[in-house]
UniProtKB/Swiss-Prot annotation:
Keywords: Carbohydrate metabolism, Isomerase, NADP. The gene is hldD. This is ADP-L-glycero-D-manno-heptose-6-epimerase. Catalyzes the interconversion between ADP-D-glycero-beta-D-manno-heptose and ADP-L-glycero-beta-D-manno-heptose via an epimerization at carbon 6 of the heptose. Belongs to the NAD(P)-dependent epimerase/dehydratase family. HldD subfamily. Coiled coil: none annotated. Its EC number is 5.1.3.20. The active site is at Y140 (proton acceptor), K178 (proton acceptor).
Length: 312
């Protein structure tokens, strides 16, 4: 059996899809379906069982036997960068992760987990997986950073695979439930379908991010699992592209000559807490042996637009 926590969420459900595509269906999805809209991420996927997150945590703490587990993909977390309830964030993203990590270590189960580029904070260069480059801007980033630090202490003695991925700006299918935390591509497409021009924040021409297609993220996870590689790795494309490039790709898909980008005021609450530039350093990822290319914004957004608008 393979366990995917956060399996009804964005990246988790895409990992389930990638596993399905390789013939794996003996999958336990763990999630919190209080937001019932997330069920749509699972309707076309094949899984063996579903378990509520709270019940799962209780079982892990109790040391319950789940039978033979081939891997745990731990994608379950609070991923809101605007959530400031630190206790909630640390319970969800730190304590839960530690419990599950030790459960896997005790049983030599490969453990792959979601870290984040938010660990790097507001820096504009050297996005490298080393302590001296890490200074998160929000409590979400801090919770991810702290777990990475915990893993670093454990790794030298670990007898089984432990691997974390610092996801950069992920976009693609199955993120519709994320609301304001969904990708720029998702929001721009919604605006166009609502008869509006796509909107970007003022100053967006100076913002560049490392946008990575979710299918590429899932492929990285499965490769590292198959190859039994441990460590903490950036998961981005190694390219910084502009928000304008995302808007251009959305406009190109809709092929409407009347569409143009509108600029809106930058929100006060995000000032000083916003990553204006991200670009994954892929040196360690490539050294580990991962050689596959990553989609450009133009390529990935075009694929995503086809998926989003397939029923239109």
């Amino acid at each position: 059996m393979i366990i995917v926590t956060g399996g009804a969420g964005f990246i988790g459900s895409n990992i389930v899809k990638a596993l399905n595509d390789e013939g794996y269906t003996d999958i336990l999805v763990v999630d919190n379906l209080k937001d019932g809209t997330k069920f749509v991420n699972l309707v076309d996927l094949n899984i063996a069982d579903y378990m509520d997150k709270e019940d799962f945590i209780a079982s892990i703490v109790a040391g319950d036997d789940f039978g033979d587990i081939d891997a745990v993909f731990h994608e379950g977390a609070c991923s809101s960068t605007t959530e400031w309830d630190g206790k909630y964030m640390m319970d969800n993203n730190y304590q839960y992760s530690k419990e599950l990590l030790h459960y896997c270590l005790d049983r030599q189960i490969p453990f792959l987990y979601a870290s984040s580029a938010a660990t790097y904070g507001g820096r504009t260069d050297h996005f490298i997986e080393e302590r001296k480059y890490e200074a998160p801007l929000n409590v979400y980033g801090y919770s991810k950073f702290l777990f990475d630090e915990y893993v670093r202490q454990i790794l030298p003695e670990a007898q089984s695979m432990v691997c974390g991925f610092r996801y950069f700006n992920v976009y693609g299918p199955r993120e519709g439930h994320k609301g304001s935390m969904a990708s720029v591509a998702f929001h721009l497409n919604t605006q166009v379908n609502d008869g509006q021009n796509p909107k970007l924040f003022e100053g967006s021409e100076t913002f560049q991010r490392d946008f990575i297609y979710v299918g590429d993220v899932a492929a990285v996870n499965l490769w590292f699992w198959r190859n039994n590689v441990s460590g903490i790795y950036n998961c981005g494309t190694g390219r910084a592209e502009s928000f304008q490039a995302v808007a251009d790709a959305v406009i190109a898909y809709h092929n409407d000559k009347d569409l143009s980008v509108e600029h809106i005021e930058f929100p006060e609450k995000l000032k000083g807490r916003y990553q204006a530039f991200t670009q994954a350093d892929l040196t360690n990822l490539r050294k580990a042996g991962y050689s596959a290319p990553f989609k450009t914004v133009a390529e990935g957004v075009a694929l995503y637009m086809q998926w989003l608008n397939q029923d239109k």
